[in-house]
Amino acid sequence: MSPIPNRDSTWDTVTTVTMLAGAGSQLLMPRIFYSDPEVTVGWKARWHVSVLAPVMTMTALAALNEYSLKGAFQGQRPGCDATNFGLQNCETYGMMSTQSFAGGAALGHGVAVFVVDTLKWSGGRVNGYALAGDVITPFVFGMITAIGRGVGNWETPGEVAVGGLVGLGFGFLSGMAYTLLQRPECGYTGNLICW
């Protein structure tokens, strides 16, 4: 029987917190855009309740992975095999990494929002705050999450990479659909929060 592998519980906590922070950044980040010429010209920031749709989609996909797909893929965690599966630190499978999926999804969503808001809704004008909130913040949290999952011996590099890349793709697609279907402007109400 293979020995029970060591896992770093601190990295498990850190990566869970950074995963939630990355996803939360997309939930709380306003849409920043250069407004239409028909209204007051200049940079605007509007929060949209409709951002719940792509964020909850990514949350549902992460839960599907954690509670269903991992059992179907049966990718063993580092140090686990058929002889010690079910014992301490080998109770669950690692493929694909849910934390890396969520971190990648947050980054993909943020990149899509930034690209569409910059190119379509702002006429190519780049806003530094939008770049920081939509791209840099989820990138930093996603990298800490991905590195921590490997350093803490929770998942293999392949499990982390697959989770992150699949999340990046799904996040980008959902963010693209959201930003193309939902204008950043709240209309003529001037509200900061749009439905």
Give residue spans per PLM region.
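A short hydrophobic/aromatic micro-motif that marks alpha-helical segments and, especially, helix-coil
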Residues: V113-F114, S174, Q182
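Primarily interfacial, aromatic-capped hydrophobic alpha-helices that serve as membrane anchors
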Residues: Q182-W195
